[in-house]
From Swiss-Prot:
Pathway membership: Metabolic intermediate biosynthesis; chorismate biosynthesis; chorismate from D-erythrose 4-phosphate and phosphoenolpyruvate: step 7/7
Lineage: Bacteria, Pseudomonadati, Pseudomonadota, Gammaproteobacteria, Enterobacterales
Residue ranges that the Swiss-Prot or TrEMBL entry lists as coiled coil: none
Family listed: Belongs to the chorismate synthase family.
Record's protein name: Chorismate synthase
Residue sites binding FMN per the record: R125, S126, S127, N238, A239, G278, K293, P294, T295, S296, S297, R319
GO biological process, one term: amino acid biosynthetic process
Cofactor binding summary note: Reduced FMN (FMNH(2)).
Keywords per UniProt: Amino-acid biosynthesis, Aromatic amino acid biosynthesis, FAD, Flavoprotein, FMN, Lyase, NADP
Biological function: This reaction introduces a second double bond into the aromatic ring system.
UniProt KW Amino-acid biosynthesis keyword: yes
Length: 355
């Protein structure tokens, strides 16, 4: 299976399955001398860790990071960084009833048709459990970008179902299990998730990610545009079905006189472009929004087929998130951090810019 790596100069390769003994990653390209500790990794991993909230999956994992290589006496050495996390709370028996069934809306069918074999336990490699190592790698990128360049990357829940959350306070985002910046919507989100769990159903979500203080010049035309690489990295997250940069699909209803980001001696007067022009960062905040589908792992009985093509009924009994968007914020932050980190190293190499 190819496609397990992302990045050119800052390159991340992940491995492992949902119910395997461990997950891991190799990170190449980290500059030497960056101060980083287990706490830096753990802080990010705990933000996406399952079992920490009654609103998400009740699979309880410690997600304790183990550093194998590339870090000595609290600093990166410039060599490959190896990281692993143990799986400790698998319940593979929950999937006994669907070993020969394809879960509708999941990768079961396509994996089996492509490879002729699949791991039915929690989705195997296609499980969102894989993203724990993206967050671990993202912790390195996030710290490097902030320490060296003052770049701050953070996200929040923008929408679940028909409930919209406005960015009223970044402080509120980390105070609730929804990553919601609007305290007035917390109770509505609470009621919605409780209702979905009772019904055995799920719902989709939107997440917005913002990178502040990104320097001008990141991105390479034509095929290595910064926005194209961001779309690639964000779209690679499980359940993501859409990516918007800046105003995204709203530009369809805009006129050129409205959408263009006019300039004066102080800079841009708007940021409809989301901080990227011609595939290159323009110094404004980089803004991206992702749409995540409702998980198909639900208790509601549905229709499917088995390995022999016979029609069957299916109900998923495993522990699952009623809304995968509730734990997607740190994952999206990590992927944006990894992509910007890669591009800042590429820009430094090509243009000798260190800012």
């Amino acid at each position: 299976m190819a496609g397990n790596s992302i990045g050119k100069l800052f390159r991340v390769t992940t491995f492992g399955e949902s119910h395997g003994p461990k997950l891991g990653c190799i990170i190449d390209g980290t500059p030497p001398g960056l101060e980083i500790s287990e706490n830096d990794f753990q802080k990010e991993l705990d933000r996406r860790r399952p079992g920490t909230s009654k609103y998400t999956t009740q699979r309880r994992e410690l997600d304790k990071i183990t550093i194998l290589s590339g870090i000595f006496q609290g600093k990166t050495t410039g060599t490959s960084i190896g990281l692993t996390v143990k799986n400790t709370d698998q319940r593979s028996q929950d999937y006994n009833n669907i070993q020969k069934l394809f879960r509708p809306g999941h990768a079961d069918f396509t994996y089996y048709k492509k490879y002729g074999i699949r791991d039915p336990r929690g989705g195997g490699r296609s499980s969102a459990r894989e993203t724990v190592m993206r967050v671990a790698a993202g912790a390195i990128a996030k710290k490097y970008l902030y320490t060296k360049y003052g770049i701050l990357i953070r996200g929040y829940l923008k929408q679940i179902g028909n409930i919209t959350c406005k960015l009223k306070s970044w402080n509120e985002v980390e105070k609730n299990p929804f990553f919601c910046p609007d305290v007035k919507q917390i109770n509505n989100l609470n009621l919605l998730i409780k209702k979905l769990k009772k019904e055995g159903d799920s719902i989709g979500a939107k997440i917005k990610i913002i990178a502040e203080k990104v320097p001008i010049g990141l991105g390479e035309p034509v095929f290595d545009r910064l926005d194209a690489d961001l779309a690639h990295s964000l779209m690679s997250i499980n359940a993501v079905k859409g990516v918007e940069i800046g105003d995204g699909f709203a530009v369809v209803n805009q006129k050129g006189s409205e959408h263009r980001d006019e300039m004066n001696k102080h800079g841009f007067t708007n940021n409809h472009a989301g901080g990227i022009l011609g595939g290159i960062s323009n110094g404004e905040n980089i803004i991206a929004t992702i749409a995540l589908k409702p998980t198909s792992s639900i208790k509601k009985i549905g229709k499917t087929i088995d390995l022999h093509g016979r029609e069957q009924k299916i109900s998923i009994l495993g522990r699952h998130d009623p809304c995968v968007g509730l734990r997607a914020v740190p994952i999206a932050e990590a992927m944006m951090s990894i992509t910007i980190m890669d591009h800042i190293l590429r820009h430094r190499g090509q243009c000798s810019k260190t800012y």
